[in-house]
Amino acid sequence: MEILMKSGDLNKYDLVKNTLVLVLAGGRGSRLHELTDKRAKPALYFGGNRRIIDFALSNCINSGLNRIGVVTQYAAHSLLRHLQTGWSFLPQERGEFVDMLPARQQIDDSTWYRGTADAVYQNMAIIKNHYRPKYILILAGDHIYKQDYSVMLMDHVNSGAKCTIGCIEVPRSEAHEFGVMAVNENLKVKAFVEKPKDPPAMVGKPDVSLTSMGIYVFDADYLYKMLDREVGTPNTSHDFGKDVLPKCLEEGALYAHPFSRSCMGRNTEGEIYWRDVGTLDSFWQSNIDLVSENPQLDIYDQSWPIRGNPVQAYPSKFFYKHSNVHPVDNSLIGGGCVITDASISNSVLFDRIKIDSFSKVDHCVVLPQVKIGKNCVLKNCIIDRECEIPDGMQIGVDMEEDKNRFRISSTGKVILVTPKMLKILEGHEIGEEGHLD
């Protein structure tokens, strides 16, 4: 693949100051089941003290892109609170901001965004009249990765493209979840199909497909034209992958940007890191991966920091009065936790968690404000926020029993536990859960 960007071709400052970023953060993430019943997927916790959307937003700031709009829709309350408290530090007087663009009632009485393209279209008047960008970078707010978007912007301008799509190589067996493309030697897209049942392989790589990352750079005027045209198309699904990108392809305006050119997070073997944590298994695994000695994703890297809004909690404390208890091993522990004579291994614990005597927590992701009683055994679990695990409960030991009590992942490996499930087990009547996430 030919390298498009040449040193000194563009003034990076002029490029980023004329770019508006739109982060699409309105999705539910239905494959995460009860984990996203009360929160949008981008607001889901990740890595001990962050939210998923913090990765896309941190990439923007680290790339010098400080004009950001976050498009919200489904169960947006916790996401909006997170943005207000954790991402309001940019100086408005310098034209820098993280603005929130929630779904709102239109003149034609439509209230919900009908697709990814419609989410941008319904905000087009604001974009044109208020932000007035020359380029628009569109991101999904629910992926885990580190990327310098300014490199992609430079490639976009140098290529002469009207639209550039971020791409990554994935195993062909997984490519049916994404848009799949073929490119020529100059990275011009020659074919594109959204979520094909039988994904085409890359030339010379029969087990690999080139897929869309859901990241697009548009010349602003070209995007306005394409969205005006798309909204009037019969039987449209109002989706970038299904409707807009194929039209860009027909016009010869679509180019690809390989993620390897702008990736800022590589593992010790030099492999690029990008995760779509859209299932219980992938969410659990991506968190558990962080506890290894040399994780694929380095959350401690100060050269490309992942910002957020960590809870201001007291330091965690550990009491071990019995020598036969194996203490904490290979785990991430958030602030404000109290651990008493409990064994914790290969797990990610968020903030304000209490674990009582002689309990064992192994390969678990435990979200904030969970209480785990005495003599409990938890293995391969995702424990949702504010769960209270009663004394002696075992989860992840007898899968047949767990199937009747909790949510089991599609692979049968991971168990999701929520407060509602625990209340049903206790025989309590279930009303509306009203906690602020």
Swiss-Prot record:
Enzyme class: transferase
A Gene Ontology BP annotation from the UniProt entry: glycogen biosynthetic process
Keywords: ATP-binding, Carbohydrate metabolism, Glycogen biosynthesis, Glycogen metabolism, Nucleotide-binding, Nucleotidyltransferase, Transferase
GO molecular function: ATP binding; glucose-1-phosphate adenylyltransferase activity
EC numbers, comma separated: 2.7.7.27
Keyword check for DNA-binding: no
Catalytic activity annotation: alpha-D-glucose 1-phosphate + ATP + H(+) = ADP-alpha-D-glucose + diphosphate
Entry keyword annotation includes ATP-binding: yes
PANTHER family: GLUCOSE-1-PHOSPHATE ADENYLYLTRANSFERASE, GLUCOSE-1-PHOSPHATE ADENYLYLTRANSFERASE-RELATED
Function of the molecule: Involved in the biosynthesis of ADP-glucose, a building block required for the elongation reactions to produce glycogen. Catalyzes the reaction between ATP and alpha-D-glucose 1-phosphate (G1P) to produce pyrophosphate and ADP-Glc.
Family: Belongs to the bacterial/plant glucose-1-phosphate adenylyltransferase family.
Protein name, entry field: Glucose-1-phosphate adenylyltransferase
Source species of the chain: Haemophilus influenzae (strain 86-028NP)
Taxonomy of the source species: Bacteria, Pseudomonadati, Pseudomonadota, Gammaproteobacteria, Pasteurellales
